[in-house]
Amino acid sequence: MAEQGAGEADAGGGEPPPAAVMTAAAEALAGQRSLPTPFLTKTYQLVEDPAVDDVISWNEDGSTFVVWRPAEFARDLLPKYFKHNNFSSFVRQLNTYGFRKIVPDRWEFANDCFRRGEKRLLCDIHRRKVVAAAAAAPPPPSPGMATAAAAVASGAVTVAAAPIPMALPVTRAGSPAHSSEEQVLSSNSGSGEEHRQASGSGSAPGGGGGGSASGGDMGEENERLRRENARLTRELGHMKKLCNNILLLMSKYAATQHVEGSAGISSIANCSGESSEAVPPPPPLPPAILDLMPSCPALATAAAAAGLAIDGEPDPSARLFGVSIGLKRTRDDAAAAADEDGGGEDQAEHGGADVKPEAADPHPAGGGGGSSTEASPESHPWPIYRPTPMYHAVRPTCNGPDRAGSDQDGSSSSQTMGPGEFDDLQKMMVVQQSNFVMHWGRSECGSGVRGFGW
């Protein structure tokens, strides 16, 4: 009996009393529940701040909060409160605390314990990953915990009943919706979010596969992003191909216009005299340069020849180095001009001097008192130069160097010629002119050179 009493005393002294163990655990849990996490506290302060209501604020009834401007929220507020500017990281944090996205077209989040004017409920919001890990791998019961459980079952200790409600947020945390921060990046994010919501609702009630469900969600998200990246790559390649096709079409059209514009010039001749097939077509010139200033004389001559061939009518005017110099003046025209002048024929009729007929004239002029300037019906191939004679009164020469224009007696009277002497002088001048013209015409005809019609 003494040995049994000593053993009981040793056993009682070796293990702490069950009431003390449960009291310490309850105090620790109560201390944890008394203060919310810094993330929840800062988020609540952001939503409550009226100065940033245009960026983030409560909804009408205060049950949810809305991020109206995600870009400004990430740029201005996140670095101030959370030391980063990643909006996706903020959304993932909300997801771990059980927040759910209400509508797909707006960043509106809700939680049963996150309401306007009820800040005390923030203590009931816990991280979902910690609870899931504790539920997935429960520790083996120790002898002390078994004794505490027996004491609770017997009703001896009532303080230990306080920590039991801590499992209630697990049901609220396992909400059937997950927040998706990648919805702003792709139009297919709605279906991915629904898929993740279905997977989350299926795994939350069990509680045992929380860690594996989170890993599966990350894998599915990576796969979705990979598919999205591949799709964008294909679209980019398609757009590049379209741009290349448009550029090729425009270059072909420009080349066609270039060939059509320069085909008429390049097919005739080139400035160096080489074949146009061996030389690439010249670049097109502006219309003003093409019309007013040809690139070379060869092209100008060829273009003129082509224009004559197209018209089909020969140019009656004579040309000197490709330039028209007017119609050739025939003997008929020369005779008509002489008739209009009337000077030469009248003087020839008075004198009756004969002009030697030309060899090519089939009807020579008659001698005697006939006119020597009668036009033959057949025109000669060379022009006749008939200048209009100019007559001046003949004054006698001076008698001496000191008596210029004065008579013997010192008078300044001039001595004029008689009518017969003046007529003889005119006849002599006409004969000399006719001989000069005939001699010049024969010499020019013998050398094969035609006149210019002057």
Swiss-Prot record:
Residues 216-246 form a coiled coil. Residues 172-222, 333-421 are annotated as: Disordered. Exhibits temperature-dependent phosphorylation. Gene3D superfamilies: Winged helix-like DNA-binding domain superfamily/Winged helix DNA-binding domain. GO terms for cellular component: nucleus. Residues 225-254 are annotated as: Hydrophobic repeat HR-A/B. Keywords: Coiled coil, DNA-binding, Nucleus, Phosphoprotein, Stress response, Transcription, Transcription regulation. Residues 182-191 have a biased composition (Polar residues). Residues 203-217 have a biased composition (Gly residues). The hydrophobic-rich region (HR-A/B) corresponds to the oligomerization domain. Homotrimer. Transcriptional regulator that specifically binds DNA of heat shock promoter elements (HSE). Belongs to the HSF family. Class B subfamily. This is Heat stress transcription factor B-2c. It comes from Oryza sativa subsp. japonica (Rice). The gene is HSFB2C.
